[in-house]
């Protein structure tokens, strides 16, 4: 059993951290996530100092079966597979 959390800029994930009692590991998401973060920061005018840094946060720790490496890899794969859905949620207008 390992704990994991997601480091994100606003609602865009960037990194998965996973840990057990002995060690912590991280899995950086692919460049397309950072490119999206950078594009949104520019769009919102949040590219300098505190405006950019204030967007960063971490989810609460959650638990999942597996070693820290297995958990970080699995959660990262799920986020990678959900990238297109994230884009649609973020950019498509909502009805109504």
Predicted regions and their residues:
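Acidic, aromatic-enriched beta-alpha/helix-loop junctions
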Residues: 21-58
């Amino acid at each position: 059993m390992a704990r994991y959390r997601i480091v994100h800029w606003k609602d865009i994930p960037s990194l998965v951290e996973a840990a057990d009692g002995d060690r912590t590991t991280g899995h950086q998401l692919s460049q397309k996530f950072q490119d999206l973060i950078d594009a949104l920061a520019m769009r919102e005018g949040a590219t300098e100092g505190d405006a950019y840094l204030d967007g960063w946060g971490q989810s609460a720790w959650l638990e999942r079966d597996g070693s820290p490496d297995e958990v970080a890899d699995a959660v990262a794969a799920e986020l990678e597979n959900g990238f297109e859905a994230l884009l649609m949620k973020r950019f498509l207008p909502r009805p109504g």
